[in-house]
Amino acid sequence: MSLLSASLTDIGLKRSKNQDSIYSSNEEGLFIVADGMGGHAGGETASNLAVKTIPKYLNENQNQSPNEVSSNSVKKANQVILELGNKMPELKGMGTTVVQIYFKGPFAYVSNLGDSRSYLINKSQLYQITRDHSLIQEKINLNIYTREQAAADPNKNVLVRTCGLEENVDVDVFTYKVRRNDIFVLCSDGLHSKVSDSDILHIVNKNIPDPKKADEKDLHQTVVALVAQANANGGNDNISVILVVAQ
């Protein structure tokens, strides 16, 4: 089984800086989206540190199980970001979301902190793999809110877990057995807050009707179409998306 991918990050229509960072490597089987937060250059610095630290840690710790190294690589990024923030007052309080997929053998190990997401598309069905670490998601989990009520809450962007703000973090890791023709989507909230799950599925299916015949051009035009739709729907935030097809 081989991997085909395409990625794109875009500043959007309302922000003066792009605080998202992405990492994409078919060879390593590693794909990361990080959505930074923090004043001045904090968000850019945090997300950039995450996408540099995680691959380095993974490559240097292949003796660990894929599940362990997926979690520990994010924890290492958390430590690096926190330490730099403590050393440099102008960066204190910076942080980032992280969502990553690490392919090893027949499995995909999906880990996350924050509200950047991973989706799986298989046989024209879309499934959200990750769970947002947000105040809204916690209320949904407790049946306090429906998803419709949550969408209208003014505090919908408040995160309860991020990378770089606290010394100890719990990283969610999901293990999934990959099947041929599976399509994985990683994205920041600049995409999923502006483009519905059904529209994400429609755009992917329209551009990749048959995953086993897809090529790099098909994947590239898909990520371009997803970003364009987020901008057409307001483009309030930076937008990042990575698409991975298992062939």
Where are these regions (language model features)?
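PP2C/PPM-type serine/threonine phosphatase catalytic domain
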Residues: 1-247
